Amino acid sequence: MTKETNIREIVLDILLEVMEKGNYSHLILSQALEKYQYLEKQDRAFITRVTEGTLEYQLRLDAVIDRFSKVKVKKMKPVIRTILRMSAYQILFMERVPDSAVCNEAVKLAKKRRFDGLSGFVNGVLRNISREKGSLSFTAPEERLLMPGWILSMWEKEYGRETAEKIAESFLTERPLSVRINQSLASRKTVLESLGAQGLSVSEDWGPGFVLSIKDYDYLDQVEAFSKGWITVQDFSSSL
């Protein structure tokens, strides 16, 4: 098994647990990252990004796949639709990953999961997506805003279309993690130096002095300040 195939298979298993079995994404992803913490940072980052991205963009990904497949996503075998979703995400949103590599690894995954007969189908759909991705457009609100239609309809009835769309758009904004400094264990300076040394992005220009906003970390338990109890996860609103 190649290194790339390995990490993609990990993503496949995570997504099957979440999308097909209904398990909580943050728990399954966290368990996987802990299990495979021996992998290099960039591999764990890949696992995290493809998992979270596929889940976040599922509505749009399904719409794209349906455009290029005679078999609708809902009628596909769970393994096949999951391989297509995670691969379509890479093709559409990860420019540094060659489309040819995505297609080849998807075919390998299909064959490894004993779907040799559908490997050609997987390859065909993905190569069509790759070829036509520059001309794709999304006009349906649920595809554009990545929100189920019934939720948008409910918000529109309550607040009007413009406000409903603004609410949906707010969910597309990447949110850093808010943490509270345990001042009895470490000073603000110590925490900032520790986070900076590990390459995390830190925002400290808002909120109480003991609350920070962090991002660009791979695995929270490997953040020194967190593992030592210097910081704990806390919503900004609860610290006011």
Regions found by a protein language model. Give the residues of each.
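Class I Rossmann-like S-adenosyl-L-methionine
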Residues: 1-225
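Conserved SAM-binding loop and adjacent beta-strand
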Residues: 227-240
